[in-house]
Amino acid sequence: MQRLFDRLTGGRGYAPYPFQEKVADTILKGKNLFLCAPTGSGKTWAALLPFLSARQTGQLLADRLIYVLPLRALATSLYKETIKACSNVFKVKLQPEDRTREKDEIVITIQTGEQKNDPFFEGDIIFTTVDQCLSSYLNMPVSLPGRVGNINGGALLGSLVVLDEFHLLDPDRSMKTAMEMLSRLRPFANFIIMTATLAAKSMDMMQEILGGEIIRLSDEEVLALPSHSEKRRAYRWIDKPICTDDIVRSHNHGRTIVIVNTVDRAQQLYLTLRQEFRKKDKGAEVLLLHSRFYPADRKKTEDVLMDWFGKDARNTNAVLITTQVIEAGMDISADNLHTELAPLNSIIQRAGRCARYAGARGTGTVWIYELEQDENGRSRLGPYRDQSEVINDTRKALAKLNPAGEILGFYAELDLIDRVHTEQESAYLARYDQDLFSLKQKILAAMDGRNQTAVRELIRDVASVNVIISDQPEMLRFDREKWPQMLPVPRSSLYKLKSYLSGGIIDDTRVAAIPDETGDESDLRFTWSWPTDIDQLVKASWLVVIHPDYAGYSAELGLQLGVPGASREPGYFQRPLIPRYTIRYETYGEHVRRVMDAAREMQGFNRCASEKLAACYDLDSGRIEKLVEIACALHDVGKLSVKWQNGIREWQEYKDPAKLTHEPLAHSDYDPEKDWREKQPSRGNHAVESGYAVSQWLFDNLDNEMVAAVIYTAIARHHGAFSKSLSDFQLIDDAATWAGLENPPFIQGKISLLDRPQPTDRLEFADDYLLNFERDEEWWPLYAFIVRRLRLADQKSQKGDARYED
């Protein structure tokens, strides 16, 4: 372990701290863990080290590590640091499709609303956000079209899930949902919950609910940390809102960070401070960073930041105006940190960006200012509008500090946090058991597609939606090889457009459009509607396209809503959110064989999940893999319908008739760059029909009817997370023969198939036969695993790991 740590940290003779070794030992023993340690102490390496050690030694600890963070900026920062460190030991790849299975290879990815590099959580180490993780658990992943919503939940099984900065979760929404998720996953995954500022009583209560061990650093361990041994960080309460004069006066050509609670406030303050420093200190570098920059523009600022505020920075005389995006984990430090009032645990997190390093940079001042007031004399709470009591308690606690500044060490900070947060956190946690039935009902309804407001109810009310600025949404192409760049914004920020929407259309200009999805993933198309009501806009599933008369963007200020901007061609990612490739002619038998081969190739990346599922359902792990193979072998039986075969053969006649044989087809030639405008012959649906066709055979040949239901539900939903509508269809005469040709050897005999369902059969299959998780809750883990394996195998099944779905 020590040698691995030394190599990860550049071979400079560093050894892990005792608490990091204790964390690693606990996790390697298969236990769950709560870790309380100060900012800058090395919590991240405490979580990563056991996973990397297991990978290096071949120990089966977890199939992947999912590192979950409350903020996108923090995910990006840790992602970059981990790549740099792991490159000293491993062969690092950054995309799942670049995997070569070499020895010591590790795939490190990031999936946030801003950086969508791993939409299906296929990396070995995945950095993501709370929104992404919890919404994936709910089968409603933010930033992804709803049709692919049931792929990511299965990635949680067999994983080591790290929830960092846990105290920053909304205690009445995301924290409760995360606890329910971890409770459900306990037989199937391991977890680490990490925090610097969660009240001690709250952590004890969570341990009672979830089990696991608690590791807290002693006073001696904290003082032994280089970043804390000589730290002198003073806190000062200022009973008035932030003003530019105070910032300029205390700056003194040093390093200053200003943190405010909203992007709008940051943009306004940046413009004012930039002007002020131009008058009084032309040499000062004034920077702006928040969540509404395109990745390239944001990266430029973050790179510049390290030169001024990073650990090895030599430059001084810089001012950064920012928001909560740097509240946790970003490795920068200032001499003076000015912040608007926020909940105390957030204040302490922000303070972690002041006097962060040893030596001369271990001294600094945190200035905390009163909030601005609205025209009615009420505090502008911004994102903390639901936490007014905590804000008031924080205000009272800070007002008792020495007006000249009071130096607080780690345990003095924790004592202050206990006084402010214990009562509310304890009340929320005490209600967890009382609210659990209602919470589960909402979660299970979301998993079934029956709770469209689940993200707002169960994660956070300001959950993000993607925004594009364009006056012609119909010209945006989502079915090409590029996917348009988007900016995630809190849904609440869309209320800036309310006055424009009240009349519906103003001066014949449409304000904002939302998409309605049609087609499968391989041919995803949108029709556009223009809401005239703000509630419609705020409830948009994942994307809003705003007319440039009502939104603007610049590399200096980022996205501004309610401010006109010039119309510009939307930027495109170099690879689409859901990759689409040219589809090749493929017979039914060839396709089934390739899907099964792809599933077998993924088996090694799912060993831990298979073993844990087998233990839970009293099966052997080999049986779990056989269930995956059965799903893959039978998933496209619905394509053996008369309508499907007539339609696909007609299209192939148009593309290249010389390829046609007597065999039924699974795919025809299709080039998304050339053929997307062409109207193809109707083939009807096939996914739910496939599930129905094989359902009776599964009942007859598996010894558990619920396992049969898991498989045919996964088949029915291998193109849509909530598909349930069964159409009338008739199979070709020799469908059973073709369906049995490529089956794995353990499937003996002829496959009997159903078709031509009566209207009552169609209703009964949708309502009674397909899994309903409110009724069939205990089978969600097995379903989530099998449907994920099936859909990913279906994507990867063409030569060269070309991805497609049809």
Predicted segments — roles?
Residues 133-186:
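SF2 helicase catalytic motif II
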Residues 1-36:
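Conserved pre-motif I regulatory segment
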Residues 198-252:
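Interdomain hinge/linker at the junction between the two RecA-like core domains of SF2 helicases
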Residues 268-271, 275, 279-284, 288-303, ...:
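C-terminal helicase lobe and adjacent C-terminal extensions/tails of nucleic-acid helicase motors
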Residues 385-401, 616-806:
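Divalent metal-dependent catalytic cores for phosphoryl transfer on phosphate-bearing substrates
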Residues 86-142:
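Inter-Walker segment of RecA-like/P-loop motor cores
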Residues 64-78, 250-274, 288:
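Conserved strand-helix element at the start of the C-terminal RecA-like helicase core
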Residues 44-45, 61-86, 198-202, 263:
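Conserved Walker A/P-loop ATP-binding site and its immediately adjacent core
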